[in-house]
Design a protein with these regions (language model features):
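Conserved beta-strand-loop surface patch within small alpha/beta domains used
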Residues: 1-77, 86-141
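Metallo-beta-lactamase
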Residues: 83
Length: 141
């Protein structure tokens, strides 16, 4: 990830869209592996939050399994994804308050706007406080 953009393969966007569509009324979440500045793989992780319609908590065992697979593929954690089922793909006040991980992009997806996938990236760590990062979609990967 550079300061201004992040490369994401079209097939990864489609995988995220499919995941959103499996549970359209709940927030879904997952991890994205790759190399700095470029996504390579999407790892869906169960949302174990009791308030799944507007919050997410990544399942710990699912996170560990995804990180082990990333390591075996020589990938690192480059983004954390979650969906907003009824609003736009912008950080909520809770997303901003909880912050992000330094150097890890926060991807937010939504189909809440006319059923069309909206996917956006943000840096939610304390230093950046919600700065948007342009997502560049390509056919590679």
């Amino acid at each position: 990830m550079t300061d201004t953009h992040f490369l994401i393969p079209r097939k990864l966007v489609l995988a995220i869209l499919h995941h959103i569509q499996t549970q359209p009324e709940q927030e879904v979440c997952g991890l994205v592996g790759g190399n700095p500045g470029k996504a390579a793989s999407y790892y869906p992780v169960d949302n174990i939050d009791p308030l799944k319609t507007n919050r997410f908590t990544l399942d710990g065992a699912g996170q560990i399994a995804a990180l082990k697979t990333m390591r075996s593929r020589n990938e690192t954690l480059v983004a954390i994804f979650h969906s907003h089922p009824h609003t736009t793909a912008q950080p909520s006040s809770l997303d901003i308050a909880l912050g992000g991980h330094s150097g890890v992009l926060s991807l937010i997806g939504s189909t809440g706007t006319r059923g069309v996938l909206e996917l956006r990236g943000y840096r939610l760590d304390a230093a950046e406080n919600g700065a948007e990062v342009e997502l560049l979609m390509g056919d590679e990967g």
